Amino acid sequence: KADQVVHLMDGWASDDTHHTCGAFEWSHSGKLHMLEGIATSTTLETPWGPHRSQGAGGAYVMDPRSLKIRQFALPGQYNMWCYVFNGWGQGIVGDGTTANHAWDTPLSGAQFGGRTGLNFVFNNEGMRPALGSEFLSSRNFPDEVQGQFTYACVINMNGMPRFTVNDNGGGYAGARLKNADGSPDDLIRSTDKHFRPADPQ
């Protein structure tokens, strides 16, 4: 339990608990990134003035030193639940509803008005939802698994599929890992519908 609690900001939307602000992730630059779905109406009060967002969703970026906050939209994503940074500090954002994942850096500057036209990192083969994601990096896994991408899935499968994510021109592209017979080579999979992984981190 904290010795002292300081209330810094108020006004995060709570219209829809599935869309409310979550997926808190610290970037390599020390900023706190947070995701919010589109079915919300946030009315933040900050030391720098109010920030209003109605039905926009996307990623919030907060500087903990100055308490400045900004927001950028994520076209083609509606209910973002997954945020993870690779070793180079490049963010990958995953939509909870569709499990589509996108590279966030090209989106983090100017605002985009539409919700289409985004190239996703890989074909998720209809898997959904994406509850949390991670780049695998652990001494508990063999060398060939290090750096692979995974997310938790609980509807089309109960488990965590594995993907490659590599440089591809000016962005990233990946693919689901397969066995020699073409079947998915998942990190973990269960036939028990009560097995519902949520946060790979």
Where are these regions (language model features)?
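Beta-propeller domains with acidic blade repeats across secreted/periplasmic ectodomains
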Residues: 1-201
